[in-house]
Amino acid sequence: MVVRDTVPTKDFSLPHSSEAPERARRIVEEQLAPLLSRVRGHDLVQLVSELVSNSVQFSPPLPDGTIGLHLQRSDEEVIVAVTDGGTHLVPDELAFDSHEHERFGLFLVDSFADGWGFSLDGVKGIWIEMELRDA
């Protein structure tokens, strides 16, 4: 995950339940989407919703029973990370295919985010980056 100490960050704990995607959408809509164009803001909200939905459906929670949502912004970009208690698979083990439903979220992330990656520092996490530009 790309982390810069000099930019504003916020961390949220989401329930490991069907409520989590909606809460994540509301948080991102309020905190980050206004910084992006309408289309890119909508894309970011949808990507985060997909990642949180996958976390609820396919991974166990963090030790405290939640899913982590980390928001970070700078003058150039916004970054969102979703963490859970899932297995620590490397990206090659999570290869995606646009026709494979269970990996479709990664296909969307790869298609719409400006950057993304995995965190393997004690908790499983995926981060996405969207540049603050109109295109």
Residue ranges and their predicted role:
Residues D11-P21:
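STAS-typified acidic loop motif
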Residues H16, L32, L36-V39, S59, ...:
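Short coil/turn residues that cap or connect secondary-structure elements
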Residues M1-D11, V56-A135:
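Conserved beta-strand-loop-beta-strand hairpin that lines the nucleotide-binding pocket
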Residues R25-S49:
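Conserved short strand/loop->alpha-helix "switch" segment adjacent to the catalytic nucleotide/phosphoryl-transfer site
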